[in-house]
Amino acid sequence: MALPLYDSQPARRVPWVTYLLIAVNVVVFLLTPMSNFAAWYGNGSVRECKATHFTFEYGAVPKELTTGDQQPLPTEVVHDCGPAGFRKAPWTTAFTSMFLHSSALHLLGNLVFLFVVGMGVEDRLGRWRYLLAYLAFGLVAVYGFAWTSPGSTVPLIGASGAIAGVMGAYVILNPRGRVVSWVPPVIVIRLPVWVVLGYWFVLQWLSLGDEKSNVAYTAHIYGFVAGVVFALLARRAGPAHRLAALSRG
């Protein structure tokens, strides 16, 4: 798989919102028990249990989103880590889950894609429309995943659904763009954006039946499609509308 490194077409202005989203995701990760940086959570099994409770508290549990009711923790979690000591409004987790990551590698993988495609989409949409679109893509991805697996009590976390939406929008808003990508083991090549992101989308689709994976491929697909649809509508709005948006951003 080709890993995108940077957009060969530089942005026309500083992508402050993309930088802000990257910074927020990094800071949130460092302050959660999933990060070794947050030493105040303890070590070993204590940290693992706090990370588990934290994930269930702020992650998006499909059954909670579809029913509107907080669900009890799984029996094995209660056995190993004790009962939940929190109450939550399930709908809020559709937002909070977008900023949680299970590991530094999970975080890095998401932010690489956001860095590459986010700047271009922000450049074309304007800062506020881009920020609102990012959050909307994330919501579509989270709720799409929940509707597809309404009985699941496994929390969904990660920014990948929202970032997938940005990727879908990028393909439409910059169809002739090229992305400098790393093809393992040593090849660095400039590829058309539709090749890199189209290949990524096909991989997500083909991986839907992988029951052993803990990757939310369905959320990725919902987010990507939401980004494509949004960008098509934005493009149809006309050049004047887009220029006005750019001047406001």
Residue positions per predicted region:
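A detector for small-residue-rich transmembrane helices and their helix-helix packing motifs
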Residues: 1-249
